């Protein structure tokens, strides 16, 4: 069976340390577990899931550019780049791929500097505060969005 959609999941700096880094804020589940669970969910929906975690901004920008006309949707947890990266914002605008911004913690209930996002105003949606389950919510939302877009054509 041919995949119906391709979704790119991007994770920014320090997310490789999930499960070890501040588990009271970010949870005990490691990123590899989160992506494995998401892969099972994607398989059930006939979605090809691609994933990249990088601590380097330019690698995330390159992955976004490489997704042009190759992926149908992006799920991105930009982590600390949320508050600093005009480059990631511009990359997302340049490819015009719909995307959801995901955060494990509720960034609006944390330090003031975490409340500003360079991506939220251009995102299809934002999910925050649900821990690892936020990725699952994002994949469900992406699937619904893409199916509706096909019907609306």
UniProtKB/Swiss-Prot annotation:
Belongs to the type-II 3-dehydroquinase family. Pathway: Metabolic intermediate biosynthesis; chorismate biosynthesis; chorismate from D-erythrose 4-phosphate and phosphoenolpyruvate: step 3/7. The record marks 21 as: Transition state stabilizer. Substrate binds at residues 77, 83, 90, 104-105, 114. The keyword ATP-binding does not apply. Pfam families: DHquinase_II. HAMAP family: AroQ. The keyword Ribosomal protein does not apply. This is 3-dehydroquinate dehydratase. Its EC number is 4.2.1.10. The lineage of its organism: Bacteria, Pseudomonadati, Pseudomonadota, Gammaproteobacteria, Alteromonadales. Homododecamer. Catalyzes a trans-dehydration via an enolate intermediate. It catalyses: 3-dehydroquinate = 3-dehydroshikimate + H2O. GO terms for biological process: amino acid biosynthetic process; aromatic amino acid family biosynthetic process; chorismate biosynthetic process; quinate catabolic process. GO terms for molecular function: 3-dehydroquinate dehydratase activity. The active site is at 26 (proton acceptor), 103 (proton donor). Keywords: Amino-acid biosynthesis, Aromatic amino acid biosynthesis, Lyase. InterPro entries: DHquinase_II, DHquinase_II_CS, DHquinase_II_sf.
